[in-house]
Each structure stands twice: as C-alpha cells, then as structure tokens.
C-alpha cells in the first residue's frame, strides 16, 4: 500500500483543536498518557499469549523504552506490546468509535477545557495529548503475531489530515516519535524525563528504560580508577521506575501522591479521586483491591455501551481492564484494580460469569464500598454530599436491583424535601426521627424538579398539617420506591396517588361528615362533570387534600402518575391506557360559581367550558401537556373579557 493522505473525522479534528489550543497548566501529562497506553498494550499481548504463545515472538518480557534525541529534536516512546493493524490504526486514531462523541464535544465547548482537562482523559483519547508538545507525530506499529512486512506508519501534524502506509517492522509493538515544538525541547532533558516518570508512572509494572550516558574515569580490572587516563563516556540502559504494583504494598508504604497518580493511570481522569479504598481480603477468597470513588461523574455514565468494571489481575498478571462481573451495575463509577490469588491465569469471560470466587470477591467488594460510603456519610458529611450529587442517581439503582444490600443502600439515600432548603438533603432515618406525633407514613412526590414540585397542589394539606414531603426528582426514583415499600416500619406513600390523606381517626370522621354534606350540595354537579370528562378521567370526586387550589389529578393507589408516564414516553416505551381521578376542592369559589350556574340552567354551555378548563388546569399544574392549547387560551380570554365587563358594570 502506497502512502495515503486522509482526513480526520470532524469530531477528531475538533478534539485535536481543543487539545492543541487549550492552555494546560501541566503539559507533562502527555508522557504519562503515552506510557499508560504502552503499558495497556503490553498487558494485552501478554494476556493473548495465554491462548496463543506465538504472539510473544520470543520476547516474553514487556518493556517501554524512552529515546530522547537532542540532535533531531525528537522524543520516541517504544513498546513491545500488542501493536496494531492498519485497520486498527485508522479506527483508534483517525476516528472516534463512540456514539457519545457529539455529547462529549458539546460538554467540552460548554466548559473551559483548561480548567477541566479530565474531560479529555475520560474519553480515552490521551494519545492526542502528544500534540500539546509536538508539531508532528509519527507512529510505527505492527500487530503481534503478524508478518514483519505488515507494519503500519502513521503521521500527522494535527492540521486535519494524516498519512498512513504499510511498512516493514522487525519487532512487535508500537513506536511513537514526537517531533517537539521548539519551546518544548526541555522534554529531551534526562532530569525532566526522570522526574515525570517518577511522579506519574513509577508503579507501572513493566520497566520504563532509557539509555543514559555518564562521563567517568576508566577503571582497572579490580575496579580502581586509572590515574592519568582521562575520562570516557559510557552509555547504559537504566530503568526509571520501581515497577512495584502499588496495590501489593501496605497502605502505610503508599503516599497520597502515589495513590493519586495511580488513580489517574487507571481512570484516565485528570483530577484527584474523592476517596481511596485499599484493602486485602483473606480466608475463603484471597485478593487485594485498590478502588477509587471519582470526584465527578464521567459524561458517558449513563450510556449503555460504556466500558464498566475494574481491572482484574491474577497474581499480578493482567487479565482484563473492565471486569464487569466484579461489581454490580449500580457501582459502575468505581475505578481501580483487583488482584486475585485464587483464579486461574487462563480465566475466560465465560468462567468469570460463573466462577464462585468471582461471586465471593464481588460480595466482599460491594460490602466494603457500601461500608465506606456509610462511614463517609457519618463522618465526612460534606464529602459524601459531593459524592451523592454526582453519583446518587446511579447508587439508587441498587435499591431496585440488589435486594441483598437494600438495607445498607436505603440508609445512603438523600432527598430534598418541603422541610429543606434547595440544595440541602435529608436521609430517610432523619425524616423518620423528625416525624410529628400522629404521622404514620413517609410521604413523597415524584417529578422533574424541585421547583415544579414545590407548586404542586398535592402538597397543600401536608403543608397545612406540617408534614414533611420528600421531593423525588431523579427518573430512577420511580423504580426506587417500587423496591422500597417501607423504611423503619413506616410505609412510603405518594401524595399524588390514592386517597392518602394524613388524619387522625377523629379527623377522618370529621372529613367524612364534611364530604357527605358536600356531596349533597355538589352530587349532581359532580355527576355532570364526570359525564363531560368521561373520555379523560376515571372518576370525579371532592378532595380532602386541596386547601387552596381548585383541582388536581391523582392516580389510583397502584396506577401510573404523570411523572411515570413522562418517563416511559421519554424511553420510547408504550404507555398503558389509564385514566386518573379528578379531585375538586369543595371550598373553592369556582365550585360555588359552577353550582349556582348548574342550579339555574343545566344546559348552560359555559358549564362544559368550565369542565374543560378545570381538567386542563389540573394538567398544567402537574406539568403535563394539554390536548388543545388553542381552545384553552380562547376560553381563558373569553372569561377575562366576561369578568372585565362585569367589573366595569356593563
């Protein structure tokens, strides 16, 4: 194949422009990213060698070599990892094979990339960081196990195009040469390279080597310096990193900086983790785990194709970089490494799904993570709140799916409520502890936002009685309450479902007597309204929950409410046919007006208009769309005109 000039995908070029032209405060990270990629490539070839020894090509030890060339102004990073084919080069570098590309770029544009470099790393495109320091990048690679003539040479100046051609390459792996910008030549200095490797990549388990030239006095056979012999230059390959797997060390031996840099290595995040969990398990299942809770959620946290799971090693041998079986889906934000002593080295994906040791490890990891979160909530409330604001919606999934840990998870939940300021939260335990005497249930309402829910007419009787109502504003909350019917012996009740009216037995008797009296006054009118709205509502009844508003819609005890219908439609799910109950406030002036009109002339067309207006008003107050906005606005305008004329005495 001759040299071919190709264009980057539009999204790749936009990404490159952002990287090249953003003013990073720390450009050193380009080397960390390239070393990390090289380490991953060696992991992969050694893993493949368990099934196919030929890919090793007689070179079983992984190595990463750094080659600074001051004369040429280049820095080369060479690995003997898995390498790439021509197709893989174009897929991994010329394009971004990710459905979230546009969302990611939109996220970058909305934020100052210089302040949020972690967004680049989260997307797994650390290779492009090379262009921060280089005005030309050359990559030569060959897939392990392929013919020596099947190498690939890729080159770009980051100007929107790249060249690619086949070439010969003796050894497997990848060699990246950075043609450094004039002002970036410090990255050719030995001390600079050493300091970067020591700071960012000391824990990488493969040797990171560099040829180092020393000036020394010649020595005799016994090692003594030879007088008068002058000096000679001697070049030797030196290893720059300690290669000690950080997770195998005791916590007392690891510094916070080392923990932080290892987190950045495994997560491709550029920020510090919020929490580090480092522990060893012994007994029926022996393993070491180094886990991290990120400070911020990645942009693709809710994308189904996102890679999930932590890295799995068996006796320090890399197995996979995303073992989904080690953690349940609701903990998919956790990053880190698990190193087992009990699993076989040739473990397959099928074995991972069924292996009893994996299940034991998962149980231990989940228990440790949840206990850490519980401890944070008790002792580091501010940190836990930061975590919950980022990952609360994901953690809530566990209440629905993980019955075994439901009791632990329910104590980690936080909600805003009618008794908290915006941005402040209450736990279920705190809610129960401050329930007033006589309150027997935990009340909640679901919706799209606190601002919308605060205006809900369903809250009126609860506010009047001083009962706190939880605001559940995450879509997942509808499933949370299905999996959490009660807490601490108190049932959870939705204030917009059924006949949930907080009252003592005596109050209930008074309400029933009042309702019977109102039914005598409004009974025929209620039948009329129900007849007019028969296609839209299941029932029309007088309300005990309204104190100020004229009307509201409520669902049956187990029916779909407006919020659940919205969520199902947003998910392109079929929404079952259902009618709700229209409740009318017997003490509202509109009821008296309608009753008067109804008593005078049951055929008055204005009565049918009032029925439509009340139903549409109930929809609008809950945030639901109305079927005929034009008719609604026309009726409102007509009422305004009539009211204005009456006020003017016309």
From Swiss-Prot:
Signal peptide: none annotated. CDD domains: HATPase_Hsp90-like. Its main location: cytoplasm. Coiled coil: none annotated. One of its GO terms (molecular function) is ATP-dependent protein folding chaperone. SUPFAM superfamilies: ATPase domain of HSP90 chaperone/DNA topoisomerase II/histidine kinase (SSF55874), HSP90 C-terminal domain (SSF110942), Ribosomal protein S5 domain 2-like (SSF54211). Homodimer. This is Chaperone protein HtpG. It comes from Geobacter sulfurreducens (strain ATCC 51573 / DSM 12127 / PCA).
